[in-house]
UniProtKB/Swiss-Prot annotation:
It comes from the Bacteria. One of its GO terms (cellular component) is plasma membrane. The complex is composed of two ATP-binding proteins (AraG), two transmembrane proteins (AraH) and a solute-binding protein (AraF). Part of the ABC transporter complex AraFGH involved in arabinose import. Responsible for energy coupling to the transport system. Keywords: ATP-binding, Cell inner membrane, Cell membrane, Membrane, Nucleotide-binding, Repeat, Sugar transport, Translocase, Transport. Belongs to the ABC transporter superfamily. Arabinose importer (TC 3.A.1.2.2) family. It is found in: Cell inner membrane. Its EC number is 7.5.2.12. This is Arabinose import ATP-binding protein AraG 1. It comes from Burkholderia cenocepacia (strain HI2424). It is a peripheral membrane protein. PROSITE patterns: ABC_TRANSPORTER_1, ABC_TRANSPORTER_2, ARAG. It holds the Pfam family ABC_tran.
């Protein structure tokens, strides 16, 4: 039986980097084919070739046994292919309905039939079990809701081949289950699916087969994934055994370094209070919509507080905007690193040196290009940032390497006291996670107070000294590491009316 989709000896080269080297594998109708590998292994590059964004330098793509060449994304869509990238593609000022039907809006004599469009979208969303308001503007939705819109857009095009790149990275448990049901239904309909994820549970739950990438090459393909041990997949991905990804070690903690008392804002149901000691890692866990990120933005001065007091090393501080927080040695690595964490048009070196430049300019000093280059090279080597050189634009790096560059920025900060990390390993492979945890521990050993917001419960349990749990806009409780386990944390995180159902 011929494959619904075949990659035959695909090669792709960028300046200084061989992104793909001789990639070949098949995806069959009625099959979910997992694609795994470290960040920068070439998975997303392959999907961009499939989606018509890039053209291969070698090899060919075959759909139903016929060679195809996609000059652009429109040609790929016309061939019945839908690619849902990790970097979402939408128009923020348009509604859900308008985004879903972009380029296909029903019209008469040049006038869009909005009522007909909304009715059609509402019916299709109901069929897929997705709860979204067709009139809501995309720019006002959460990242999780925007991701569901992208997934629904592909499904509404009735594509025969669907590729999903980290589709659950921002979804809640309930939204993830909706997606899993959609994937199962699509497989039953005979669609061919490619599924990229760093989450082993998802790969084993959804995928029939799996291909492993490393450094742009195919390491292995497994036609019967259920028979392959997880440890083997991890070793194939990273090229080494990782016995304990979290490698937590107890530290001596200092006095309370930072505290927030009675912090309140529009996204919170009640004022929130918490504290962090010097050298302590406090994990914040909660379901999507619990208010964790919103609380951190209030503390950091990114959003206006209605009330609340902040204390640093026993002294009250005034933080009304992000610049105030940074001057006090408080920094935030945001959840949406593409929009808020990196300067996409700048180089890796420039992104790493932002903190150093601020100190130089404040002191009235000239920017020292040689020092900046040495700093960038030191952190590129120290954090194993995969880039052809320091001058590479950071937008061309994988998510994990972008995140390591952001963390390098703050490692270079001499006056750092409080580090807030919002989903620091979202969409990042197991090897890069291991390295990012090293950075977090290094910051804690320097005496920094660390706040880590994460939706991955094993991560929170594995890295944190103490866990604060939020539920529906309020702090539901906290647990010391010794008393924390999945049951105890979820018991605090789940709405009480849904605890039995979710269990």
């Amino acid at each position: 039986m011929s494959a619904a989709l075949r990659f035959d000896n695909i090669g792709k080269v960028f300046p200084g980097v061989r992104a793909l080297d001789g990639i070949s594998f098949d995806v069959h109708a009625g099959e979910v084919h997992g694609l795994m590998g470290e960040n920068g292994a070439g998975k997303s590059t392959l999907l961009k070739i499939l989606g018509g964004e890039y053209q291969p330098d070698a090899g060919s793509v075959l759909v139903d046994g016929r060679p195809v060449q996609f000059a652009n994304a429109a040609a790929s869509i016309a061939a019945g292919i839908a690619v849902i990238h990790q970097e979402l593609q939408y128009v923020p000022d348009l509604t859900v309905a308008e985004n879903l039907l972009l380029g296909r809006l029903p019209n008469a004599f040049g006038w869009v039939k909005k009522r007909e469009a909304k009715r059609y979208v509402r019916e299709r969303l109901a069929e897929m079990g997705v709860d979204l308001d067709p009139d809501a503007r995309l720019g006002r939705l959460s990242i999780a809701q925007r991701q569901m819109v992208e997934i629904c857009k592909a499904l509404m095009r009735n594509a025969r081949v669907i590729a999903l790149d980290e589709p659950t990275s921002s979804l809640s448990h309930r939204e993830t289950e909706v997606l899993f049901k959609l994937v199962d239904d699509l497989r039953a309909q005979g669609r061919a699916l490619i599924y990229i994820s760093h989450r082993m549970d998802e790969i084993y739950r959804l995928c029939d087969a799996c291909t492993i990438f490393r450094d742009g090459r195919k390491i292995a393909s497994h036609d019967a994934l259920a028979d392959v041990p997880r440890e083997r997949l991890v070793a194939e991905m990273v090229g080494r055994e990782i016995a304990d990804i979290y490698h937590y070690a107890p530290r001596t903690l200092g006095d309370v370094r930072f505290s927030a008392e009675g912090v309140d804002g529009p996204a919170l149901r009640e004022p929130a209070s918490f504290s962090v000691r010097a050298g302590e890692i406090v994990g914040f866990f909660g379901l999507v919509g619990a208010g964790r990120s919103e609380l951190m933005r209030l503390v950091y001065g990114a959003d206006r507080r209605r009330a609340g007091a902040l204390t640093l090393d026993g002294k009250r501080i005034d933080v009304k905007r992000t610049g105030d927080a940074i001057r006090h040695g408080i920094v935030l690595c945001p959840e949406d690193r593409k929009e808020e964490g990196i300067i996409a048009i700048a180089s890796v070196a420039e992104n790493i040196n932002i903190s150093c430049r601020r100190h130089s300019l404040r002191a009235g000093l000239f920017i020292n290009g040689k020092t900046e280059s040495e700093t960038a090279d030191r952190f590129i080597q120290r954090l194993k940032i995969k880039t052809p050189n320091r001058r590479q634009k950071i937008r061309f790096l994988s998510g994990g390497n972008q995140q390591k560059a952001i963390l390098s920025r703050w490692l270079a900060e001499p006056d750092l006291k409080v580090v807030i990390l919002d989903e620091p390993t979202r969409g990042i492979d197991v090897g890069a996670k291991h390295e990012i945890y090293d950075v977090i521990y290094r910051l804690a050993e320097r005496g920094c107070a660390i706040v880590m917001v994460s939706s991955e419960l094993p991560e929170v349990l594995g890295v944190s000294d103490r866990i604060v749990v939020m539920r529906e806009g309020r702090i539901a409780g906290e647990l010391p590491r010794a008393d924390a386990n999945e049951h105890a944390v979820l018991n605090l995180a789940l709405p009480q009316t849904s605890a039995v159902e979710a269990a």
